């Protein structure tokens, strides 16, 4: 059910996100995701967790390369061994710091994934670091607690703005070359919930 929701939710969010009248689109399927995730978790368990960073890299590759904006596809060129190195160092330091370094580990992985993502000839850059992430997470947590949950919506919006603010594009994008794909135009009038539930129209 979680995998159905993750695929459906991404397809739905992408189909409802647009810029200059052109939509994003996620082309992944439930079947592909089930195979990838099931294999990844099984091998991670059998390897006592050492396969997990390789799975993360392969999942990022799948998730990114199945996403498009208009008629141009995003791409990912990360290296599994580099992800493993970041993960192993992060796990060791997380243990030594009683869990505090976990924010740096997550930030380092996220930054690596974004820095190895491209859209056409433009590359995405990330300035997300552990210290910033820890600070924003504490602010969100404290604000929600102090407002007894009432301020959760504000905190989430602040957190989203913070995260998106760490991303930028480096390179030229020819906006004239970006066009609505035929698949998007054909399905633009369909029910959005069909995307959420992974149902083909």
Whereabouts are the PLM-identified features?
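Membrane-interfacial and juxtamembrane segments of integral membrane proteins
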Residues: 1-201
């Amino acid at each position: 059910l979680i995998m159905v929701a993750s695929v459906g939710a991404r397809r739905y969010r992408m189909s409802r996100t647009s810029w200059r009248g052109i939509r994003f689109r996620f082309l992944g399927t439930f079947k592909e995701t089930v195979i990838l995730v099931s294999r990844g978790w099984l091998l991670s368990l059998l390897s006592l967790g050492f396969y997990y960073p390789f799975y993360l890299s392969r999942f990022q590759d799948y998730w990114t390369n199945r996403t498009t904006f208009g008629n141009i596809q995003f791409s990912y060129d990360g290296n599994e061994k580099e992800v493993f190195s970041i993960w192993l160092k992060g796990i060791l330091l997380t243990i030594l710091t009683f869990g505090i370094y976990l924010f740096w580990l997550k930030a380092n992985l996220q930054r690596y994934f974004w820095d190895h993502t491209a859209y056409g000839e433009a590359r995405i850059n990330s300035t997300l670091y552990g210290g910033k992430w820890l600070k924003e997470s504490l602010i969100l947590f404290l604000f929600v607690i102090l407002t007894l949950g009432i301020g959760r919506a504000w905190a989430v919006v602040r957190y989203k703005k913070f995260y998106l603010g760490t991303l930028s594009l480096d390179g030229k994008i020819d906006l004239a070359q970006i066009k609505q794909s035929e698949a998007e135009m054909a399905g633009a009038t369909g029910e959005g919930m069909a995307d959420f539930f992974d149902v083909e129209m």
